[in-house]
Amino acid sequence: MSLDELRDRAALYALIAAGSVIGGCARYLVGVAQLSLLGTDFPWATLFVNVTGSFVIGFYAAIAGPDGRLFASSRQRQFVMTGICGGYTTFSGFSLETFQLLRTGHALAALINLGVSPMSWLVAVWLGHLVATRLNRLKGT
């Protein structure tokens, strides 16, 4: 890999990281607002960021895509979609990928993704919790 390629790659990673900082801070602020306005009875902040982030990634993918009205370079798309939306949501990439499957006529794959992904996430959370709980019970340091 040449030095120019390394610089280009490093610049892309820096853009994605900067977008992630913006998205992550925005998500945190939504969470703080939710706690003070709505309390802790329901995860409104997560619902809000996932819905709004899914809207933003879908909108930006269309408006800045090859047939879109807005010219955006690959780096700009990565900054917004991978960085900001990825840092802001826990759901936008999954939503976009599932929508793309539906839009391109792969309804069965989209349905499988809708069923398998959330269940896998829940199982993974459960397993992670189980492993950590058992580790916490071990004696010693």
Swiss-Prot record:
Segments traversing the membrane: 12-32, 44-64, 79-99, 107-127
One GO term of the biological process aspect: cellular detoxification of fluoride
Chain residues that bind Na(+): G86, T89
Alphabetized Pfam families for the sequence: CRCB
Keyword terms, alphabetized: Cell inner membrane, Cell membrane, Ion channel, Ion transport, Membrane, Metal-binding, Sodium, Transmembrane, Transmembrane helix, Transport
Membrane-protein topology: Multi-pass membrane protein
GO molecular function list: fluoride channel activity; metal ion binding
Main location: membrane
Annotated localization: Cell inner membrane
Keyword Transmembrane applies: yes
Protein's UniProt keywords contain Metal-binding: yes
Purpose: Fluoride-specific ion channel. Important for reducing fluoride concentration in the cell, thus reducing its toxicity.
Family: Belongs to the fluoride channel Fluc/FEX (TC 1.A.43) family.
Entry protein name: Fluoride-specific ion channel FluC 1
